[in-house]
Amino acid sequence: MGVFFAGFKLLTLRNNVECSVYYPTTTLTDPVNYVPSKRAWLRFHHYLKLSGSKLPSWIFHLGLSFLNYIELPVQFESPIISKEHLALARKFPVILVSHGMACNRNLYTTFAREWASNGYIVFSVDHDEDINLPSGYSAKELKAYRFTQVKKRKEAILRVLDYISNADNIQDFFDNSGIELDLTRVSVVGQSFGGAAAAYTAMADKRINGACILLDPDLESVYEEMKGKSVNLPLLIIRTQSMDASLLRGGDNKEMIFELVMNNRERFKQSMSCSFENASHISQTDLVLHMPREIMMFELMKDVGAVEDYLILNNKLTQTFLDTMLYDKDPSGGFQSIDLVVRKFLTFAKKVKRGTKLIVDKVM
């Protein structure tokens, strides 16, 4: 955690676009309920069915009913800090988040709270798409179906970006606090299917000009559309072996990730694909904190003993990457190398004595 608490507000735009907003605050207020809606958990149950689970929906909802009583560790509608609290009274950098297919806008609060406590404003967009696949579709048709959903996600993300690009909207949303967003440092983050949406959106709109972080991205649905193209931003990809094993095309997703890094030619020295030893796909979400036994039962993670390690190290690596790429400049005024991020992170990992190993992929 940084020097601030994390505030929380809900932003609702036209066409039912909802967004959880996390921001730095110094005021303690009430917490927020973890579950944003019943439909959010329907998506998770549908995902389990696609993964082969035969668990009846009533048992699923009964078993996870305790989540309705869990509260997010954030401060509901607390006032945002003034810009004088920030170093050099700078403007607030922005992070746009696209969640995984079975997830929701509140499921990355561990990350969002970390970033907000360090002075970032995070807009986590909710995507209410149908996870169930149409019957009788060929593999090509299924990929096209998922790509249509990626495009809708891009539209939702850009709708949020349109809104926050208007200074008057920001003043209204933050109660005329006088704060300013730094629209020269707009970053995008996505996990799993949200990683595909984040990368695709970054390529489509140059207003996303900060950094791109992809957490275990599933790139199959956008591969043909992004082939040979570059996000042209500092790029951090944290993948897991469990994701590679779960995809229909197996190891091809890893090759797609490596290709995305290689294509990022102008920012290759600021790009990295990596993983944490034995981490699983779900270890990048808040679920590992709230339901470790259930995760073991659903066989979504082999070892929950290292949950705290994964969360702490994921948070620190992403925070170090953002701060270094957005604010640390080399002697010529350009971006620092990704090597500096790795050195800073390894120094932290050694200091806190976390045993989980960072594996940096050799992308050639």
Regions found by a protein language model. Name each.
Residues 189-194, 198:
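Gly/Ala-rich beta-loop-alpha elbow adjacent to hydrolase catalytic centers
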Residues 39, 46-58, 106-139, 269-273, ...:
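Active-site machinery of serine-nucleophile hydrolases
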Residues 86-89, 209-281:
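The feature captures the conserved acid-bearing segment of alpha/beta-hydrolase catalytic domains
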Residues 129-131, 137-183, 200:
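Alpha/beta-hydrolase active-site loop
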Residues 73-92, 97-134, 244-247:
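Short substrate-entry loop that stabilizes the transition state in hydrolases
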Residues 1-94, 318:
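Domain-level recognition of soluble alpha/beta enzyme cores
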Residues 278-282, 287-364:
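Alpha/beta-hydrolase-fold serine-hydrolase catalytic core, especially in secreted/extracellular enzymes
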Residues 200-210:
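Conserved hydrolase catalytic core segment
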